[in-house]
Protein backbone atom coordinates (compact mmCIF):
# COMPACT_ATOMS: atom_id res chain seq x y z
CA UNK A 1 0.00 0.00 0.00
CA UNK A 2 1.04 3.60 -0.45
CA UNK A 3 1.37 6.14 2.38
CA UNK A 4 2.52 9.75 2.44
CA UNK A 5 4.98 11.37 4.83
CA UNK A 6 4.79 15.14 5.13
CA UNK A 7 7.83 17.02 6.44
CA UNK A 8 7.85 20.37 8.26
CA UNK A 9 9.13 22.04 5.09
CA UNK A 10 5.91 20.99 3.36
CA UNK A 11 7.56 18.34 1.19
CA UNK A 12 5.54 15.13 0.78
CA UNK A 13 7.33 11.78 0.47
CA UNK A 14 5.53 8.76 -0.98
CA UNK A 15 6.38 5.36 0.50
CA UNK A 16 5.40 1.83 -0.53
CA UNK A 17 4.72 -0.17 2.67
CA UNK A 18 2.73 -3.08 4.07
CA UNK A 19 0.38 -2.80 7.05
CA UNK A 20 2.57 -5.36 8.86
CA UNK A 21 5.67 -3.10 8.54
CA UNK A 22 7.03 -1.71 11.78
CA UNK A 23 7.62 1.97 12.40
CA UNK A 24 11.36 1.10 12.36
CA UNK A 25 10.99 -0.13 8.77
CA UNK A 26 9.15 3.04 7.75
CA UNK A 27 11.87 5.21 9.31
CA UNK A 28 14.50 3.16 7.45
CA UNK A 29 12.66 3.79 4.16
CA UNK A 30 12.57 7.51 4.94
CA UNK A 31 16.33 7.40 5.56
CA UNK A 32 16.86 5.66 2.20
CA UNK A 33 14.87 8.40 0.42
CA UNK A 34 15.84 11.51 2.40
CA UNK A 35 19.04 10.64 4.26
CA UNK A 36 17.62 11.52 7.70
CA UNK A 37 18.86 9.03 10.35
CA UNK A 38 16.01 7.11 12.06
CA UNK A 39 17.11 8.21 15.54
CA UNK A 40 16.39 11.84 14.55
CA UNK A 41 12.94 11.06 13.12
CA UNK A 42 9.65 11.34 14.98
CA UNK A 43 6.55 10.20 13.12
CA UNK A 44 3.13 11.56 14.11
CA UNK A 45 -0.23 10.13 13.04
CA UNK A 46 -3.62 11.31 14.35
CA UNK A 47 -1.84 13.45 16.94
CA UNK A 48 0.14 10.54 18.40
CA UNK A 49 3.86 9.86 18.21
CA UNK A 50 4.48 6.44 16.68
CA UNK A 51 6.64 4.02 18.68
CA UNK A 52 9.40 2.13 16.86
CA UNK A 53 8.40 -1.45 17.75
CA UNK A 54 4.73 -1.15 16.73
CA UNK A 55 3.30 -1.85 13.28
CA UNK A 56 1.30 0.39 10.96
CA UNK A 57 -1.81 -1.74 11.58
CA UNK A 58 -1.47 -1.12 15.35
CA UNK A 59 -2.14 2.56 14.65
CA UNK A 60 -4.85 1.82 12.05
CA UNK A 61 -2.75 3.40 9.29
CA UNK A 62 -4.37 2.49 5.99
CA UNK A 63 -3.55 3.16 2.34
CA UNK A 64 -2.99 6.79 1.40
CA UNK A 65 -2.74 7.87 5.06
CA UNK A 66 -0.49 10.84 5.79
CA UNK A 67 2.14 10.70 8.53
CA UNK A 68 3.93 13.82 9.75
CA UNK A 69 7.70 13.75 10.10
CA UNK A 70 9.22 15.91 12.83
CA UNK A 71 12.91 16.00 13.62
CA UNK A 72 13.97 15.23 17.17
CA UNK A 73 15.29 18.24 19.10
CA UNK A 74 19.03 18.12 19.67
CA UNK A 75 18.97 19.81 23.07
CA UNK A 76 16.39 19.43 25.77
CA UNK A 77 13.61 21.69 26.83
CA UNK A 78 13.29 23.02 30.33
CA UNK A 79 10.47 21.37 32.22
CA UNK A 80 7.94 23.98 33.44
CA UNK A 81 8.61 23.22 37.12
CA UNK A 82 12.37 23.63 36.58
CA UNK A 83 11.76 26.85 34.68
CA UNK A 84 9.75 28.22 37.60
CA UNK A 85 12.50 27.18 40.02
CA UNK A 86 15.19 28.86 37.90
CA UNK A 87 13.07 32.00 37.64
CA UNK A 88 12.56 32.04 41.42
CA UNK A 89 16.29 31.60 42.02
CA UNK A 90 17.41 34.22 39.48
CA UNK A 91 14.62 36.79 39.46
CA UNK A 92 13.15 36.93 42.98
CA UNK A 93 15.74 39.31 44.41
CA UNK A 94 15.93 42.72 46.02
CA UNK A 95 18.27 45.36 44.60
CA UNK A 96 19.99 48.07 46.64
CA UNK A 97 19.11 51.50 45.21
CA UNK A 98 22.55 52.90 46.11
CA UNK A 99 25.08 50.19 45.20
CA UNK A 100 22.89 47.86 43.03
CA UNK A 101 23.83 44.79 45.06
CA UNK A 102 21.62 41.73 44.53
CA UNK A 103 20.08 40.62 47.81
CA UNK A 104 17.77 37.81 48.95
CA UNK A 105 14.02 38.42 48.50
CA UNK A 106 13.37 38.97 52.23
CA UNK A 107 16.30 41.35 52.83
CA UNK A 108 15.54 44.61 54.65
CA UNK A 109 19.03 46.18 54.57
CA UNK A 110 21.91 45.99 52.10
CA UNK A 111 24.83 43.76 53.08
CA UNK A 112 27.48 46.04 51.52
CA UNK A 113 29.47 48.51 53.59
CA UNK A 114 29.98 51.02 50.74
CA UNK A 115 26.33 52.12 50.81
CA UNK A 116 26.21 52.16 54.61
CA UNK A 117 23.90 49.12 54.87
CA UNK A 118 21.03 51.24 53.58
CA UNK A 119 17.42 50.11 53.77
CA UNK A 120 16.57 51.61 50.36
CA UNK A 121 15.82 48.40 48.47
CA UNK A 122 13.61 47.67 45.48
CA UNK A 123 12.47 44.38 43.94
CA UNK A 124 14.42 43.20 40.89
CA UNK A 125 12.58 43.95 37.65
CA UNK A 126 10.96 40.92 36.03
CA UNK A 127 11.98 39.68 32.59
CA UNK A 128 9.41 40.19 29.87
UniProtKB/Swiss-Prot annotation:
A Gene Ontology biological process term: protein ubiquitination
Protein name: Ubiquitin-ribosomal protein eL40 fusion protein
Similarity comment: family membership: In the N-terminal section; belongs to the ubiquitin family.
Entry's transmembrane regions: none
Annotated GO CC locations: cytoplasm; nucleus; ribonucleoprotein complex; ribosome
Glycyl lysine isopeptide (Lys-Gly) (interchain with G-Cter in ubiquitin), cross-linked positions: 6, 11, 27, 29, 33, 48, 63
Note: Ubiquitin is encoded by 3 different genes. Crp-79 is synthesized as a polyprotein with one copy of ubiquitin fused to ribosomal protein eL40. Crp-6/ubi-3 is a polyprotein with one copy of ubiquitin fused to ribosomal protein eS31. Ubi is a polyprotein containing 4 exact head to tail repeats of ubiquitin.
Cysteine pairings via disulfide bonds: none
GO molecular function, one term: protein tag activity
Domain Ubiquitin-like per the UniProt entry, residue ranges: 14-89
Cross-link named Glycyl lysine isopeptide (Gly-Lys) (interchain with K-? in acceptor proteins), sites: 76
Entries under SUPFAM superfamilies matching the protein: Ubiquitin-like
Keyword RNA-binding recorded: no
InterPro entries, per the entry: Ribosomal_eL40_dom, Ribosomal_eL40_sf, Ubiquitin-like_dom, Ubiquitin-like_domsf, Ubiquitin_CS, Ubiquitin_dom, Ubiquitin_ubiquitin-like
UniProt keywords, alphabetically: Cytoplasm, Isopeptide bond, Nucleus, Ribonucleoprotein, Ribosomal protein, Ubl conjugation
CDD domains named in the record: Ubl_ubiquitin (cd01803)
UniProt cross-references to Pfam families, sorted A to Z: Ribosomal_L40e, ubiquitin
Phylogenetic classification of the source organism: Eukaryota, Fungi, Dikarya, Ascomycota, Pezizomycotina
Superkingdom classification of source: Eukaryota
Amino acid sequence: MQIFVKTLTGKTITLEVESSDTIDNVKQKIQDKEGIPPDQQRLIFAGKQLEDGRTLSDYNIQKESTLHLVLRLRGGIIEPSLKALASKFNCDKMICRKCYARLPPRATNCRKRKCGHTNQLRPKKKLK
